[in-house]
Amino acid sequence: MKIAVLMDAPLRATLLSEKTMARLAEWGEVAVNETDKAEKETVKQIIAGADIAITSWGVPQLDKEILDCAPNLRFVAHAAGSVKGIVSDELYARGIRVVSSARILSYGVSETALGLTICACKNVFAFNEEIRNGGWVEDYSVITELFDITVGVVGCGFAGSHYIELLQAFGVNVLAYDPLLDEAAIAAMGAKKADLDTLLAESDVVSLHAPAPVSYTHLRAHETVLDLV
């Protein structure tokens, strides 16, 4: 069995430890990209004859031209979030299974979002700048506790739903907007479903976890969102 690791060498060194590479070698022949970029011609050479491909950021779309180099390819493991950049109609037509790290990566994203929420409520960034410049702020009215307030969550995918889960440790009311989920699904996460206008009007904090399909493009021009920036 041949395993083709397609991401560029610097990224591979970041994502795949020596231990991981050794484990892959136990499964079969491992071909890696030794260059600084995942150019299409390089990818075609590495994937030739492969049964499994490991991709990540920067790898080109696995189109017919690339897939023709690997007629036995059956599995693609994407060491990143969204697979939109690598999948093609040809990939699906051949019945090649694709998995990604989206769920695992979402934990770090949601934890960071919670950390930034706390920092924003405590006005940490402004206080830090004030202290760095030799000042000191005594006005505690600019601090908001993450308690007895309403937090709005826009988008309840992997990151948004885990962010809601983390908020359960705090005494906050959570409103959630996601046009793809019904009231019961959002309630099971620990939030109350709301339309976007209601969420923006009633929330003290808004955390955006919306992806970028057409159904969300109106967010960019929403006047209330712009007012929050």
Regions found by a protein language model. Give the residues of each.
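Glycine-rich Rossmann-fold phosphate-binding loop(s) that bind the pyrophosphate
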Residues: 156-157
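Conserved small/polar residues in nucleotide/adenosyl-binding loops
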Residues: 217-224
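Short loop/helix-cap segments at secondary-structure boundaries that form the rim of catalytic
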Residues: 86-90, 181-189
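Phosphate-binding beta-alpha-beta segment of Rossmann-like dinucleotide-binding domains, i.e.
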Residues: 94-96, 101-150, 165, 169
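An N-terminal-biased, well-structured beta-alpha scaffold segment characteristic
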Residues: 1-99, 201, 209
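N-terminal Rossmann-fold NAD(P) dinucleotide-binding loop
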Residues: 160-161
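NAD(P)-binding Rossmann-fold cofactor-contacting core
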Residues: 170-186
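Short acidic-hydrophobic, aromatic-tinged amphipathic segments that line or gate anion-handling sites
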Residues: 192-195
